Amino acid sequence: MDASTLFKKVKVKRVLGSLEQQIDDITTDSRTAREGSIFVASVGYTVDSHKFCQSVADQGCKLVVVNKEQSLPANVTQVVVPDTLRVASILAHTLYDYPSHQLVTFGVTGTNGKTSIATMIHLIQRKLQKNSAYLGTNGFQINETKTKGANTTPETVSLTKKIKEAVDAGAESMTLEVSSHGLVLGRLRGVEFDVAIFSNLTQDHLDFHGTMEAYGHAKSLLFSQLGEDLSKEKYVVLNNDDSFSEYLRTVTPCEVFSYGIDEEAQFMAKNIQESLQGVSFDFVTPFGTYSVKSPYVGKFNISNIMAAMIAVWSKGTSLETIIKAVENLEPVEGRLEVLDPSLPIDLIIDYAHTADGMNKLIDAVQPFVKQKLIFLVGMAGERDLTKTPEMGRVACRADYVIFTPDNPANDDPKMLTAELAKGATHQNYIEFDDRAEGIKHAIDIAEPGDTVVLASKGREPYQIMPGHIKVPHRDDLIGLEAAYKKFGGGPVGQ
């Protein structure tokens, strides 16, 4: 596409050089800029990428978007704008032909449950023989092909490219985990959502947002912006068991479907039965009551299942068809995942990293604990420490607790575990500043019949260490290796 055509929608700009050049790529990553690319520089929290403009010029890039004029060769066109990332969004959606308009787009937000709900929607679509894509904490997936991702919600250009990739692969729908960071930072500008789903709102990310009010406002942006084009059928799915849904109902102009277990809602779960093999319940709907069975464990997953079913149903699939699909879904990786049922202990990994998430996790497993419940939890570095003692208090619902860091980054691991220990309500705990050693200790003290829960990371494949270096780490593999060494069995899978 000709650059002059691309920039027609950008009204506030100063152009230094010629826009008469062909463009086939936009990037915010200086390492990928080349001839035919537009490089968009920005001022981030840690890095000002304007300093890479000369490097991209050396790589053959002839067009940069900047917030102030740079000292560059005369053959490099500079487009100076006040907000480079907002312009990046406009350019990306224009160049890639508004890809989110070409499929059904589901957006899932909330403190806990985003990954589970989003993954369930994707898996239901696949069971229905529909081409589907997923993007979130567990990476990027088109049908069954997976690639890793860096952020729950990538920056705007990368996100648009992923949606375009899904469209080109024939995806009929795409499900996005929508983080509060992504909403506030404008990473989702221009994405056309068809269905927005809310799970819950509990304390998290106050290091970024400052207050719960600001955090809640960030989440609400998905719902308030959903109605920008009222000519399309768009829907909102809200959890009535969370009081924040009342506010979200007031900010969206779209039709709302509610679900709940404890509070009255249009769609409800009754007569709940739970085990470590899954759940069953009566799904009470405006159209009748249906029996639902699922391999997902825990009462909180019933809420997630309902949210996913309603979202898919809202776009035209019958509930009967969806329920059949739900009964045969695969587990969501790293979400209340029981590792190797042949072991004499119940070894479980989960992503729970807030007090609310941990409470729900313990609620889910405690009825099935045969002997002791051993619970390992970590605290992330450079995050909101005000939530940490409450996490320690909740963890002490278990018989024995192990406190570790989780992605300590530049914080002192001993400080992080000490913050967790401030909330301890009994003395049956120990602190490890090395998470892997903490996991090995959990297995070492476990006896047949015990339940060992490794919380906070799920299947996240790394630890963020000082200097923000990512070091390979897998809770599940470390736990299984230690368990096989102690109890026999194996080998450890990948």
From Swiss-Prot:
Biological processes annotated in GO = cell division; cell wall organization; peptidoglycan biosynthetic process; regulation of cell shape
Report the main location listed first in the record.
cytoplasm
Residues noted as binding UDP-N-acetyl-alpha-D-muramoyl-L-alanyl-D-glutamate in the record, renumbered to the chain: S30, T152, T153, S179, R187
Species for this entry: Staphylococcus aureus (strain MSSA476)
How this protein is processed and modified after translation, per its record? Answer: Carboxylation is probably crucial for Mg(2+) binding and, consequently, for the gamma-phosphate positioning of ATP.
The source's superkingdom equals Bacteria
Q: SUPFAM superfamilies, alphabetically?
A: MurD-like peptide ligases, catalytic domain (SSF53623), MurD-like peptide ligases, peptide-binding domain (SSF53244), MurE/MurF N-terminal domain (SSF63418)
- Supply the alphabetized keyword list: ATP-binding, Cell cycle, Cell division, Cell shape, Cell wall biogenesis/degradation, Cytoplasm, Ligase, Nucleotide-binding, Peptidoglycan synthesis
Name recorded for this polypeptide: UDP-N-acetylmuramoyl-L-alanyl-D-glutamate--L-lysine ligase
**UniProt pathway:** Cell wall biogenesis; peptidoglycan biosynthesis
Q: Where in the cell is it found?
A: Cytoplasm
Q: Which family does it belong to?
A: Belongs to the MurCDEF family. MurE subfamily.
